[in-house]
């Protein structure tokens, strides 16, 4: 296979090229590329000194922090396999993941709602618990750094080796482990850089040492890896947010002069609904991208007004195919007009035949950005891979200009009698109603029609929503078979860690 520089060598190169320039900012402390190399290589040796070896699985269960960045780099520099675990998950879910992947070590914090010792008792393969706080019962993260050498030998890592297992959020079912190899961890940064060569984004998306981002998305998400690989490849710096808070995000953008941001739709909406937002102009931003879930163009246009010097973009990606796959143009953020060169993408019908322009089909992809499959799930892999193509479950169509429009997931089709209802269509209509912040449509069992539509909405701050008014509104805007049997108004809709609405949790609410 082709020879490319491993993470260890990229860190060495970045320290030489960018040296004392800032790689990360955390709690107002700036961490240079030179310090990054010193500390990461010490941590890498600390992990090796524990007896961990290539192929061993090491979980990171932390909120966003500098220790998270160091852990990623150290694991990748030694040929270990990183298991980033969403910090919202419970101990039972961690135990399930740990047993599924045969976890060997975990880097975590004592600030959790369970006894860490329970993990060791419940996961037979777990040998090492490393905490970022000093505790005599566990390995201390900073002791591994302070007591180790900063000279790290080449570990002989092949790009075909497993590098990461991302346990997907389980929005529509049980979480699954998406396996990446050591080449995949480079591709996201390279595809982001490639986006900047798209003629409609020239001199806008630069991805270089002149750029700075604020990171509100969880580092456990596959998109969180962007910040780490972009830094050591291209010199872009990142301000780390421990957790998303809309006002704090705005303040950090202003304070540190961030040039770009990428977030989930719910995060953009949270910023827009801040009472204090009228006091801010995010004039340092050059580009802002929404990703991770369907978004309303109206929402993004409202955000654009806060950023007088920025273009607003829509990105499409998924954990199973190194994101981003596609990006919109600034002129049409509803459609995706640029597809990265690492993949082939087409739309097929239920008989695996490519559909014509304007016809709806399932998005299938092939290429080196496609993941290696679901870890230890051979039957599932047989279902989602056919003739080298990965079937994403996402549905869309191409217009005559070859712009891709996504309309939802195949799992989000609600079969009402003999009719097919697209949940995304109903959600889009609901989001146009004044005062609705979030909306979700799901199918629920019905003895006569098989399924019927049920909707859940969350109001904007200080807005009072009336169920009967909402039902009347939908009767005027939707065909009868698409109209929901019921609408439930909640303060907030349940989310997964990356900010997607959790429809499985909604269905469990009844």
Predicted segments, located by residue:
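AMP-binding/adenylate-forming catalytic core of the ANL superfamily
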Residues: 89, 95-96, 106-108, 261, ...
